[in-house]
Regions:
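N-terminal domain-onset segments
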Residues: 1-129, 143-158
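Conserved, well-structured functional cores that handle cations and Mg-NTP chemistry
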Residues: 134
């Protein structure tokens, strides 16, 4: 079972999020989540739920039925810690072919080591999983003029 989005995405402006203010440090994190999560939870494993070529529509990117690679994963320690999705259009992975098929490799390995990739915007939304409520972020990145997103739902309340 994966988290379900409950609210629309709202642009995160760096101010305290009233409902989840304790999560603002995670929302504004600009480095690899895995490194920070390992400091908190120990060894982090990546479980790929699905990775496939598909058509995808996205309001924040202005995409309507764009073909690309959609990957869904859990970052896990003793339990699921973060649920993540990433979408790379075919235009993105033509510029960086590894994004066509990441398999079990952590995205941050490439995201934070490529000078052509820059973060443009961060959005927040509320999610639910079972009876629990969580906060998610959606980061919009640019790779040499082409945009893609990474969604991370934090399955904890720090």
């Amino acid at each position: 079972m994966t988290p379900l989005i409950e609210t629309n995405w709202e642009l995160f402006d760096g101010k305290e999020n009233v409902d989840f203010k304790q999560m603002n440090g995670w929302i504004s994190e600009d480095k690899s989540l895995i490194n920070r999560l390992e400091n908190k939870y120990g060894t982090i494993n990546l479980e790929v739920l699905n990775e496939e070529e598909t058509e995808y529509s996205d309001k924040e990117l202005g995409f309507e039925r764009v073909k690309g690679n959609l990957r869904k994963v859990f970052l896990k320690a003793q339990k699921d810690i973060v649920y993540a999705e990433s979408f790379f259009s075919s235009k993105v992975y033509k510029k960086f072919p590894k994004f066509k098929r990441l398999a079990k490799e952590p995205l941050g390995k490439y995201l934070f080591n490529n000078p052509l990739i820059s973060k443009k915007e961060t959005y927040v939304a509320k999610y639910s999983l079972g009876n629990n409520k969580y906060l998610g972020r959606k980061c919009i990145y640019d790779l040499d003029g082409e945009r893609f997103f990474v969604v991370e739902v934090f399955l904890f309340h720090e």
